[in-house]
Amino acid sequence: MSRATITREGARLQLLGVLDHASVPVLREQGRTLIAQGSGPLVLDCAGVEHSNSAGLALLLAWLRDAQAASRPLTIAGLPSELRQIADVSNALELLPLAEQAHS
C-alpha cells in the first residue's frame, strides 16, 4: 500500500494512496492549505485512492467545508467504488458533489 499524498496542479487536486486513520490527519492539513491558496473552482481527483475506510469519507467532507469557507466550488472526480459505498451506507453520498452528477 502506498503512502497517501495530495498534490495540486492548477485547479486540480490529486489524491493518491491509502486513506485511513494514520494518513488522514496529515492529509487534512495539507489539503486545507492547498484549498486556501488561490481562487476559483477546484476538482479533487480521487482515482488514485487505493483503499479507504470511513476516515477517507470524513476527509472529503472536511475538505468540502474548507472549500465552501474559501468560496471555492469543489467537485470530486474518480471516486473509487469502495469510498462511494462507504458514503452511501453513511447516507452521505448526496453530500458529495461528484463530477459524474454534473453531467447527468
Q: Over which residues does each language-model region extend?
A:
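STAS-like cytosolic regulatory interaction modules
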Residues: 1-55, 61-104
